[in-house]
C-alpha cells in the first residue's frame, strides 16, 4: 500500500519529465480545501494536483473538486491502484488522471488521462494565489495606480476590472506565472515587510 509520503517526491520527478520546466509551490488553502500540489508551468498555466493514496477515501473529493475548479487552469488527480478503476466516476472529464503503483520496489506512474482546460476556473479565486508584493509588480507592469494604502482584496479587484479590455487573460496568465517562478519562500517575509514599510 502506498501512502501520500511515498508518492509525493517521486511524483515531482514524474511531473517534471512530463511537463518540462515547472515549479512546485507549497500547499495552498483554497476555500474549505487544501491543494496537495500547486504546479506552475512554462506554458503559463497553473495546475492543481490532488493526491489520493491507497489509504485515502473519496469522502471529501466532491467538495475538493469544486474548490480546485475555482483556482486552477488545469487539474490532475493522482491515485493509488485501489482507486484506479473508479476514479473516472468521481472527477470531471476535463481532469487529468495519473495512476501510481509499486513495481519491483519502485514507485511507478502512468498517465491514464491528460488534463484538459478547466472551464470553471474563476479569476476572482485564481488571483488570490498572488502575494501583495507580487500584485504590486502586476500593477507596475500594467501602468496601474499603486493603491499603496488599499487592501490586497481591493487591488485584486482593480486588476480584474481591467480584464479583458486593458489586460488580456493571456497577459495576466503570463505575468502571474513569471512571478510565481521567481517566488522565494525564504525571503518573502522580508519582501512583505519592505512593501508595507514603503506603503506608509
What are the roles of these predicted feature ranges?
Residues 2-43:
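Active-site metal-binding core of divalent-cation-utilizing nuclease and nuclease-like domains
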Residues 32, 45, 83, 105:
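Surface-exposed, flexible loop/turn segments at secondary-structure boundaries
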Residues 37-39, 45-55:
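Conserved catalytic cores of phosphodiester-cleaving nucleases, focusing on short active-site segments
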Amino acid at each position: 500500500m502506498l501512502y501520500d509520503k511515498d508518492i509525493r517526491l517521486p511524483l515531482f520527478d514524474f511531473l517534471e519529465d512530463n511537463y518540462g520546466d515547472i515549479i512546485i509551490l507549497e500547499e495552498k488553502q483554497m476555500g474549505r480545501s487544501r491543494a496537495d500540489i500547486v504546479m506552475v508551468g512554462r506554458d503559463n498555466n497553473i495546475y492543481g494536483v490532488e493526491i489520493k493514496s491507497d489509504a485515502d477515501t473519496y469522502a471529501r473529493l466532491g467538495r475538493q473538486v469544486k474548490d480546485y475548479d475555482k483556482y486552477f487552469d488545469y487539474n490532475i488527480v493522482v491515485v493509488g491502484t485501489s482507486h484506479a478503476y473508479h476514479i473516472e466516476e468521481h472527477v470531471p472529464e476535463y481532469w487529468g488522471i495519473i495512476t501510481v503503483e509499486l513495481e519491483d520496489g519502485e514507485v511507478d506512474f502512468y498517465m491514464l488521462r491528460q488534463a484538459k482546460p478547466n472551464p470553471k476556473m474563476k479569476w476572482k479565486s485564481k488571483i488570490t494565489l498572488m502575494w501583495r508584493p507580487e500584485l504590486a509588480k502586476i500593477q507596475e507592469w500594467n501602468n496601474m495606480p499603486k493603491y499603496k494604502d488599499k487592501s490586497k482584496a481591493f487591488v485584486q479587484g482593480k486588476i480584474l476590472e481591467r480584464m479583458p479590455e486593458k489586460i488580456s487573460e493571456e497577459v495576466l496568465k503570463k505575468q502571474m506565472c513569471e512571478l510565481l517562478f521567481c517566488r522565494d519562500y525564504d525571503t518573502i517575509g522580508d519582501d512583505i515587510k519592505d512593501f508595507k514599510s514603503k506603503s506608509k
